[in-house]
Amino acid sequence: MRYWLCVMFDDNSQLLDIARAAEEVGFHGIAVADHVAVPHGFRSVHPSGENPFVPETNFPDPLTTIAAMAAVTTQLQFLPYVYVAPMREPFSIAKQAGTVAMLSNYRFALGVGAGWLREEIALLGQDPSTRGARLDEMLEILRGFWDDGTTEFHGRHYDFGPTSMFPKPDQHVPIWVGGKSDAALRRAARHDGWLGMNYDLDEIPILLGKLQDERKRVLDERGDDGRPFETLVIPNAIPDRSLHADLEARGVTSTVAVAWELGAPSAASLDAKRAGMEAFASAFF
């Protein structure tokens, strides 16, 4: 099992030190949250059924944050968890995420999702009702630019002729897809991994079964490219070794660790966060 450290709601002044400490302690990577601007009074419901934050919560830009963290580390991997692509347009995502991948020496996977905060998507000038269909097209566009440098696309939501974007990555940039709907699982199966978040223990095997069926269908259609397929899950349970061993036996490759109480005054200091990381590492690494 690979352990990613959850980094969200933190003070910007601590982020680089958190990255250094996470690498020293032995985390595999860091997962960074994504929101641009949170409208007050939003009515959208988070998939957990709870309101996870207030509009004034700290959300530094994830790609900028990852680039800075990568510059002060050498082994740590990085992941937006998850980057809400449909509240943006695909060209800037391809340029920015591709650049982060290259400058981090490919210690980066683009974790994407359709998003749940419809008011934020609309605020940024995008249609929340088409976010899933647009995400499907966006991921094809990203792959075209990253793999070939010059691409064209003719879809329902994006339509453009031959267009170039250089420099292009000279290694494969993984795309991991979040969500538990049937559409999200199909989307994940077509790419490089699946990101699951806060699912009950009795729900996880069902979702994994659906994912494996979709993945088999994709491989039967286009063959196996030999690249690893990541399955990252956060179970809605207190973590322990036996639980993680069971998840690993079911095909889960990674999980995200919350090493301190997010946003809690008791964890505000960098020393408290480092102590939380060390305690988690002692228990699980």
How would you label these PLM feature ranges?
Residues 1-285:
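Active-site-adjacent structural elements that line small-molecule/cofactor binding pockets in enzymes
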